[in-house]
Amino acid sequence: NSNKKHKVIKLDLPFSKDLVIPSFDKIKKELSTPYELKEKHLDYFNKNGFIKIPNVLSIGSLAILRKEILLLLKKKFSVNKRNRFLSMEMMWTENKIIREYVLSSRIAKIAADLLKVKRLRLYHDNILAKESGCGRTPWHCDDDHFPLDTKDVITVWIPAQATPREMGPLSFAMPINVYDMVSKINFNNSDTSYDKKIGKTFKQQKVLIENGPFEIGEISFHHNFSFHTAGKNNTNQLRIALANTFFVDGAKVISNPTMVSGDWKKFIPGVRPGGIAASKLNPICWPINIKN
């Protein structure tokens, strides 16, 4: 019953009022400082199709990100409501602070290294906010949503606060080959049947689920074949995340994009089905100093 009342878990504000906020120049430097992965990171991602990496971003940079996203949300949506899932796309084209986080070479290099590709382009950014009481995110994999003719697609999920289980962090099915287990289930977003079939299959097959909290500064990367979900936000605080999706340079748009792919022409303007996805809105994010 969706009207059933749940106890709201009260959390303190995500960031202390005493926190010293770094300058914009310091943030830019942090977001362009390379993060070197270890072999264990590559092995884990290769096996499981996702990875959570701690301490990628500082508490100061996340405080700035959260503040900026809150301003954007307040401009677009009425505030002080409950239960809603709010999203905003392509904010990097309008907001210079969000732009630094979306085009960050520190983050894009990690994504490229995990995919083991040399050049990576941006598909889009997506601000995702769950208000207090907002329900769970159904099981899905991103391959249905991006009309790209490549397996080299990856999304980084940057929570703009520490995200305990009660707040609804991203959760992942593992290893990545559970994709084969459910690939014949027809995707649909018109009802809950797809989500229920996936969940039932995973339960029957005793699939492992990584559903732990995200510490402050911890971010995740997941392949477009990775099945993931997120829980309900049972806290009194807004759960905010910035999700950026990247793909290998040279990838083409599939020949017959469907409605599931959404408004893909907004993200790859001027490119026809079968064409190379390299519009002005798909800059190369890694390596840096490469002409698009």
State what each model feature region is:
Residues 1-2, 6-31, 73, 79, ...:
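Non-heme Fe(II)/2-oxoglutarate
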Residues 52-54, 121-124, 155, 169-172, ...:
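A structural signal for short, well-ordered beta-strand segments and their strand-loop junctions
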Residues 163-229, 251, 271:
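Double-stranded beta-helix
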